[in-house]
Amino acid sequence: MNRLFLSVSVALSATTCSFAQQITQPNLVLFIADDCSYYDLGCYGSVDSKTPNIDNFATQGVRFTQAYQAAPMSSPTRHNLYTGLWPVGSGAYPNHTCADQGTLSVVHHLHPLGYKVALIGKKHVAPKSVFPFDLYVPSEKGELHFEAIQKFIADCKRKGQPFCLFVASNQPHTPWNKGDVSQFDPDKLTLAPMYVDVPQTRQEITKYLAEVNFMDQEFGNVLSILEQEKVADQSVVVYLSEQGNSLPFAKWTCYDAGVHSACIVRWPGVVKPGSVSDALVEYVDIVPTFVDIAGGKPQTRVDGESFKSVLTGKKKEHKKYSFSLQTSRGINKGPEYYGIRSAYDGRYRYIVNLTPEATFQNAMTATPLFKEWKQLAETDAHAKAMTFKYQHRPAIELYDVRNDPFCMNNLAGDTKYSNIIIRLDAELKKWMKACGDEGQATEMRAFDHMPSKQK
């Protein structure tokens, strides 16, 4: 319709053409944080965090309670997000990875629809041929280039061209050195059950929350730019928190805290403000959803499924299952290998640890904080239980996430849940087969997909 309108309306002013294009093809804006636990946002229940911009944004759109990603690490997550493909399927499943040559990304899918596509901030995807953004401006000293964001939007508006803008913050990824720590009183924090309550734990969390607040201000700046450029009403805006923070039981794990993400979508005139959706959606669904909103179809097969109909209110449900994996081979201070696979059905999370005989380790287990936890474990039962659970895991785990969101009580040994395990195991194996995931053999090939490990 848009092309036909333009072809018969060549006499109209550029301003009128621009307006018509924006109405039929909304601008697409996605802001993604870096290592931010969804439960550390006020609108997702945090009583300690200070996230006024995100919380207010949630009153303007729909807040998804069950948004998940396929990997609890930045690089595979972002490849998954920008390609609409499962990590093993695209080749981008370890950390610091790259997609297979010939893979198509959101840029390829939106270009034929007339969109200009930009990425401002953290990249963490490769190669360039797979991600040929029209504009890429990296962060400087960990901070976003807001001038570049405003210029990109203004240029597209002037040309009457719809745009897709990804804004990728570096916060609150460690080191936690941004934001105002004085806003938070360590002694008044409410600690999640997996944390060992020592002064250093509380100090680290205050630094993390200060950086969450810093990220919230960045998001607020982006929203302000949309208003200043008068494109907010013609833009679909998505906020994502990415995987959980780097404290134990979140990032680098397939526990719910590792792969459960905040997802809030504002679409003026379409999405009901202040609404909440329990539809199960995944990062892999973003590309087909964006392409669907833009009025087209992906140029080639993608693994994700559009949830536009959920946004428009035509459907309340989306998926029955979400799937995730963790490849620890090659991570910073990681083990030789420790592969994890997981399936989730909206209530129960099933986890398979491919090599339970190995010790799980990462950058967190090498920190003074975790070492203090281990030292305390010699005399403190909770510290002993948490440090052991984090590093020594059984072959299978099952959690009732609805009643145990932090995955503390493993139900796998209870015969009452045998049928649930059988069902989720079958779904997980079906997904792995569809992705070409051969389990431990795939784990051992991780270096083949990490440029830094190739000779």
Residue ranges, per PLM feature:
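Formylglycine-dependent sulfatase
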Residues: 2-5, 16-397, 405-433, 437-455
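Sec-dependent N-terminal signal peptides
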Residues: 6-11
